[in-house]
Regions:
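Membrane-embedded alpha-helical bundles of multi-pass transporters/translocases
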Residues: 1-512
Length: 512
């Protein structure tokens, strides 16, 4: 198991590094112009459906089902179930892909209304979407076969597959874009071909694992029907999340040209700490809280939630402060080269600062939600999520004109804060969560250490020369932030460095 965790962790880290390199290259080649806007809208479309039907709701029902069949009935029964699921998924994905290709202008009329009337951007977005939409078919089947491999404890190929997405995207920028009139199309073809490569990789791994696949005729067996019934709650939850994403895209297209790209780059930077910390924390917490509640250990469940709250706040607060206070410096060092200008970095930095304000509360949503799921309550988080979507839409409409590209980012952060506050209030009201003595001691001190860090970063930035931030200046900001967060944190006994380093190591293992 340790070897498997190391393998997955290595591939995951490689994927993140290559993903950031891909974004740097895209920024250098496309910048924030109309081609970049059209490409990012076009990329969102297959990813929206992928997260809805592939990696999210489908895997939530498929992976537990095939794991149970594999361990109770053996490889032959698991193979039969996987074949049935593949046939059903391939049929629906193929139909969805064909319909998407036919009705692509209508889809983008809804998703990118701001492009309508701007013939160049709208036409380009339609053309790019038609190139990339088949990626949906390949990547959703890749997610299915990755679930099969994970159930068989074969983790490497599934973890390596996202690396291919980044490699093909980078290769298309380096070696195909120079020979095309529009580099956006080179990147779009790289995305689609990467889907084929990822599917080929996991199919090869399944054959190596001893599962001999045949493609059966389409049939809805009792097991498949049961799996789709179990998909329904997860599909609703995923739908709420993707509706939130869609609102941000729609509003972005209604803003001045370049806004979609600016929001994309800012969000990608914000997702780096969020993906490592929040997802890992939520994944690890749910089984622990469920186990305590099943045994009637409510006090232990509350302790688990308290320790998770502290650790997530301890890790996300300095990340949020660093990204918010030094947002311009982060964007300068990461993206200012090629077509991405210093002015683009200023605009993207403002959006990044607004996104970063919501980083801790978004992570805390991942902590509070298991408190409901572990008790069999899936509807309360869903209802709160719907209310948060409505608030996000309202705030977007209020902010879009005065704040431009900062508006969607700030609306996302504020609606996430509303979501987290509602989850906390209901858990507390139902006596399912309350701060214990250790949390009451630590949390104010963590916040105070964060305030000291913010003041120090702000002061040092005032002393730096104007203009694009250099790498030495950026490293100075990182050093100052670290010293003025960890120093007060240790002195105030909010945490100690050994505990902090231990949390980072555990987060990496759980993220893997």
């Amino acid at each position: 198991m340790i070897r498997g965790a190391f393998t997955v962790g290595a591939w995951t880290m490689a994927s993140r590094v290559l993903g950031f390199a891909r974004d740097i290259l895209i920024a250098a080649v496309l910048g924030t112009g109309p081609v970049a806007d059209a490409f990012f809208v076009a990329l969102r479309l297959p990813n929206l459906f992928r997260r809805l039907f592939g990696e999210g709701a489908f895997n939530a029902a498929f992976v537990p089902a095939i794991s149970t069949i594999l361990h109770k009935e053996g490889l032959s029964a698991a193979t039969e179930f996987a074949e049935e699921a593949t046939a059903v998924m391939a049929f629906w994905l193929g139909l969805l892909t064909i319909l998407g290709e036919i009705f692509m202008p209508g889809l983008l009329y809804v998703l990118a209304p701001g492009f309508v009337g701007h013939g160049g951007r709208f036409g380009m977005a339609v053309a790019l979407s038609r190139v990339m939409f088949p990626y949906l078919f390949f990547i959703c089947l890749t997610a299915l076969f990755s679930g099969v491999l994970n159930a068989m404890s074969r983790f490497a190929a599934a973890a390596a597959a996202p690396v291919l997405f980044n490699l093909f995207s980078i290769a298309s920028m380096l070696w195909l874009a120079p020979y095309t009139r529009n580099p956006g199309f080179a990147l779009a073809w790289g995305v689609t071909v990467s889907g084929i490569a990822q599917l080929a990789l996991v199919l090869w791994a399944i054959r190596r694992a001893g599962m001999r696949f045949i493609w059966p005729r389409l049939r809805f067996s009792a097991r498949i029907r049961q799996m789709f019934r179990r998909m329904a709650p997860a599909l609703l939850g995923a739908g709420v999340t993707q509706l939130n994403v869609s609102i941000d895209i729609i509003i972005g297209t209604l803003l001045p040209a370049g806004s979609v790209s600016i929001l994309y780059y800012a969000d990608r930077v914000n997702q780096l700490p969020l993906g490592v910390i929040a997802t890992a924390a939520g994944t690890a917490l749910l089984p622990a809280v469920t186990r305590h509640i099943a045994l009637g250990e409510e006090a232990q469940a509350n302790i688990a939630l308290n320790r998770a709250f502290e650790s997530v706040l301890m890790l996300t607060l300095p990340a949020a402060i660093g990204l918010a206070v030094a947002a311009r410096a982060v964007m300068d060092v990461a993206f200012v080269r090629g077509a991405f200008t210093a002015h683009n970095a200023v605009l993207a930095g403002h959006s990044l600062a607004a996104f970063a304000l919501g980083l801790p509360v978004f992570a805390l949503i991942k902590i509070f939600t298991p408190g409901f799921y572990a008790r069999g309550d899936t509807m309360t988080p869903l209802k709160i999520g719907v209310a948060a979507v409505a608030l996000n839409l309202g705030l977007n409409l209020v902010f879009m004109h005065p704040l431009k590209a900062v508006g969607p980012a700030l609306a996302t952060s504020l609606s996430s804060a509303f979501n987290a506050a509602c989850l906390f209030a209901l858990l507390h009201k139902r006596a399912h969560f309350g701060f214990d003595a250790l949390s009451r001691h630590r949390i104010p001190r963590i916040l105070l250490a964060g305030a000291v860090m913010a003041a120090a970063l702000w002061g040092v930035q005032r002393l730096l020369p104007p203009g694009v931030t250099t790498i030495p200046e950026f490293l100075l900001l990182v050093l100052v932030g670290g010293v003025f967060y960890f120093g007060p944190g240790v002195l105030l006994r909010a945490f100690d460095l050994r505990e902090f380093l231990g949390l980072l190591r555990r987060r990496r293992r759980k993220a893997a």
